[in-house]
């Protein structure tokens, strides 16, 4: 941490994850938190999150995490069905997932988030609704529902290419996506980002679920600066993005010799930043902040994409109101396709 230069930056979130930080005892986590707070400037009462794998977290650990300052816990449940966990290769069982959630509440955590995965081969709407029902039954403050993807080089991707199973058809994936939104909205959750839902505290107020939205994740979607520490961690300080070496040994060697363990970095061009701003903005339910876009890029978004926006509005795919341009609910399943339309369009004002 002493090698990282962050002058002028003040943070309000600390996120311990990914990987499996719950393999560490609370004393070790406390050292990380203390070092972070000593090495960087933080606002009062920062959101301090730890990711927990149900297969590595005993109740004593959870109690210890709470005592050392963790105020938000994110549990990688993935599924409440054992066959799904087996398919995904998870080390925890469905019963362990249930136990860790109950333990988190038992030791006093109020801000609990659960991660689920859908779109598994052969998954039915009924089966997915059972997972959603199990999750909402615990009334977590936050739910992240991720579509299963087959990353290159992973065991799942290799099994898929070898024909051991078939990926779920696109039309069935869309049904599950729509089911997610409808079910969670009916049970008191607001979709504030394409995969993220926050519990609404009071009916008729904070309808966007802002109270329980992940403050940390919002940084990624709004071009806020962030610093990543550890192997493979990414950092972004406008307009530069960097990422650390993936090897633990190389990371330690660099740090011990007084060198930043950075594998590479890039300076984003104005056009690259615009493309990311459009894609990330459309991921959020509130959409692209038109005032912020104009301030950052010195062009009017609605003028630059006037014809495309007009066509999308006629198809009820997009809406422009209250200073934002957002995807309509029925268009959120087509995020990638619609985002690409903006990317290939010619800016009237030039890029």
Residue ranges and their predicted role:
Residues 290-291, 303, 320:
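Extended hydrophobic-aromatic, low-complexity segments
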Residues 324-329:
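Minor-groove-contacting beta-hairpin "wing" of winged helix-turn-helix DNA-binding domains
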Residues 332-351:
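Short, amphipathic alpha-helical interaction segments positioned at domain boundaries
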